[in-house]
A protein has these predicted regions:
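His/Met- and acidic-residue-enriched segments that coordinate or traffic transition-metal cofactors
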Residues: 1-151
Length: 151
């Protein structure tokens, strides 16, 4: 393996790990216990890292005049594969799906609680306020239900 490809592989691995750990669903989780590692999260990390690989080649070309066609092509192909994996949810099992849905519901709780506490629109519109409170309650209930299903 040549130096440039080894370097790109290290960059890709770092970007993949950052993509998984700093995924918005994880950052916005209401509780740390609502964060699970799932295939969908891995697919998202692959999507982020592969897009960074090919877009890095474009930036590198614009700023320095160098372009590696092979790395660009591999990045594009990995992006296409990751889109396919995300859209089809290939290999995602019942438990994998539940793990991702818990994070999704937890994000809804975080954003709803924040908007309810800081936003006059929610408190001045009784319909919207009721909807938000119901959503908060239902998401909590569904998270408990899904966590029980995982056990």
């Amino acid at each position: 393996m040549t130096g440039i490809f080894r370097h790109q592989l290290i960059l890709f691995t770092v970007m993949f790990l950052v993509g998984i750990s700093l995924n918005p669903m994880n950052i916005l989780a209401y509780r740390f216990s609502d964060i699970y590692l799932s295939l969908t999260l891995l697919y998202s990390g692959l999507f982020m890292a592969s897009n960074m690989i090919w877009s890095h080649q474009i930036v590198h070309y614009i700023s320095m005049g160098h372009f590696n066609t092979r790395i660009f092509t591999v990045g594009i192909l990995l992006s296409i594969v990751s889109i396919f994996l995300l859209r089809t949810q290939l290999f995602v099992t019942r438990n994998e799906w539940l793990k991702r849905m818990i994070g999704h519901h937890s994000t809804a709780i975080t954003t709803t609680k924040q908007l309810l506490s800081d936003n006059d629109i929610f408190t001045s519109d009784s319909y919207l306020f009721t909807l938000a409170k119901n959503l908060e309650y239902e998401q909590e209930r569904e998270i408990l239900f899904m966590k029980n299903m995982l056990q």
